[in-house]
Structures are given as structure tokens and as C-alpha cells.
């Protein structure tokens, strides 16, 4: 923030959650103006992110292991649909010791349009051999929730950086505080 003198860092970063690199670039120019040194900023933040990823690892959401373990034990098909490139997602899941829980991983490069469009979730369902109507999806971002809803899945929101606004409350089948609560909810409805 200091080096780039960002006008509204929090607002800008929140607006970028769950979007593609292209949409992030558009958002940053909208917040910071056309002279913003986007490529330099992206390189600096990417280097810092990878440094943290290598030295500290990425945090695993509360209840992730419990939910994924229960899903596998229950015989559920488990997929992941991310705007991030699949090779990055696979690397991160491997480092976190979670890769073995996923039957299908769909990265941003595998869908014609990214979130908030439904394409990425429709592709994941197709690869899993299931209908969207029979699937539950868990999201923490606004664009992810819009994507889940548009694809016809049962959208569950577990807020992280973004608190659920009125739109998210209307899109979500349910809003839960963590993934342990998601597991408990699914035990009752699935």
C-alpha cells in the first residue's frame, strides 16, 4: 500500500475477489485511474504471495478437512471450481494436503467465462457427471455466489473477507459461519 499509495486498498481488493486477472486489471484501473502501474503492482504482489506460500503455506479454512473427509466417507463426488488456473490450485491443494479429496478440479482456463458467469460450475458438474440441480456449492465471494446461483446449484455461503449483503442473502440457500457447519447442514439435507 505504501509504495503504490492506493486510494482505497480494501475496497479495491474486495472488488477483485473471485474475478479473473482481466477483471482485476479493469477494477484496479477503475479504482486507481488509467496511470496505475498495474503490471508492476501485479508482479510485486505475486512475488510476495508466492514468498508467503513457500515459507508459511496458505491457511486452510476452519473445518475444511472435516468436511472433505466426511464427503469422501459418504461417497460424494467432490469438485472444485476456481477462477485461478488449475495448475496453481493443484499445487496449493497438494501443499495443504487436501488434493486427495477432489475428484474434479476446474480452473479458470477451462471455462469460456469466469465467475460471476455460470460456466465454471457448469463445467465442473459436466466433468463430475452430475446435474447442477443435484449439487451443492460453497462460496465465500460475491462473484462465486452469483456464479453458483446462475448455474443452478444449491448455493451455500461461508463468508470470509466479504460479509453477506442483501443480494447474497437472497442468492444463498443458507449462510453458515464455517465449513464444520456446512458439513452438519449437508448431513441433514443430503
Give the predicted meaning of each segment:
Residues 1, 20-35, 92, 124-125:
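Helix-loop "lid/cap" segments that line or gate small-molecule binding pockets
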Residues 1-14:
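Active-site neighborhood of HAD-like aspartate-dependent phosphohydrolases
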Residues 7-8, 28-66, 74:
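Metal-dependent phosphoesterase signature
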Residues 16-20, 44, 59-63, 84, ...:
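Short beta->alpha linker loops
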Residues 69-70, 85-190:
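Asp-based, Mg2+/Mn2+-dependent phosphohydrolase catalytic module
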Residues 79-80, 157:
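Hydrophobic beta-strand core positions in alpha/beta domains
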Amino acid at each position: 500500500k505504501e509504495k503504490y499509495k492506493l486510494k482505497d486498498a480494501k475496497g479495491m481488493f474486495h472488488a477483485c475477489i473471485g474475478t479473473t486477472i482481466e477483471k482485476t486489471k479493469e477494477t484496479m484501473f477503475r479504482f486507481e485511474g488509467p496511470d496505475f502501474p498495474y503490471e508492476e503492482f501485479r508482479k510485486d504482489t505475486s512475488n510476495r504471495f508466492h514468498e508467503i506460500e513457500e515459507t508459511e503455506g496458505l491457511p486452510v479454512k476452519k473445518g475444511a478437512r472435516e468436511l472433505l473427509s466426511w464427503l469422501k466417507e459418504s461417497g460424494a463426488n467432490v469438485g472444485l471450481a476456481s477462477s485461478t488456473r488449475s495448475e496453481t490450485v493443484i499445487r496449493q491443494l497438494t501443499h495443504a494436503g487436501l488434493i486427495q479429496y477432489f475428484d474434479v478440479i476446474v480452473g479458470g482456463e477451462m471455462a469460456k467465462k469466469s465467475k460471476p458467469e455460470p460456466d465454471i460450475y457448469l463445467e465442473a458438474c459436466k466433468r463430475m457427471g452430475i446435474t447442477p440441480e443435484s449439487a451443492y456449492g460453497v462460496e465465500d465471494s460475491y462473484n462465486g455466489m452469483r456464479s453458483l446461483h446462475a448455474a443452478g446449484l444449491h448455493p451455500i455461503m461461508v463468508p470470509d473477507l466479504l460479509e453477506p449483503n442483501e443480494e447474497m442473502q437472497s442468492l444463498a440457500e443458507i449462510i453458515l459461519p464455517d465449513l464444520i457447519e456446512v458439513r452438519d447442514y449437508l448431513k441433514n439435507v443430503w
